[in-house]
Amino acid sequence: MPQLLTPPLSPLIIAVLNGNIEYTSELLQNGVDIDVRDKNGNSALHIAASKGYTKIATMLLLYGATIDAPNFELATPLHYAAANNYKDLTQYLLNMNANKSAVNKYN
């Protein structure tokens, strides 16, 4: 049976996963697709929120990342920040007008 391959991650997703602020900044300055997704529909902002990377999340939003973009489970970056108890990042996303009423597929 043939093996299914996972699509490669974009450089932006990799930079954010690794918490690499400098490379993330360089990619954004060079016009990378800011709303690129991984295999689960997570954007770079979802990943930053899930890891508590407030500086990277701020940078992504300054470059126009979609704050309420849902992934395949309808979760937004705010869901990830709140679920992981990243209080400062959760508050920042709320201050940036993230939809606090957004519902994912589990609630």
UniProtKB/Swiss-Prot annotation:
Cytoplasm recorded as keyword: no
InterPro entries, A to Z: Ankyrin_rpt, Ankyrin_rpt-contain_sf
Keywords: ANK repeat, Repeat
SUPFAM superfamilies: Ankyrin repeat (SSF48403)
Keyword Repeat listed: yes
PROSITE patterns membership: ANK_REP_REGION, ANK_REPEAT
Pfam families: Ank_2
ANK repeat spans: 7-36, 40-69, 73-102
Protein known as: Putative ankyrin repeat protein RP714
Record organism: Rickettsia prowazekii (strain Madrid E)
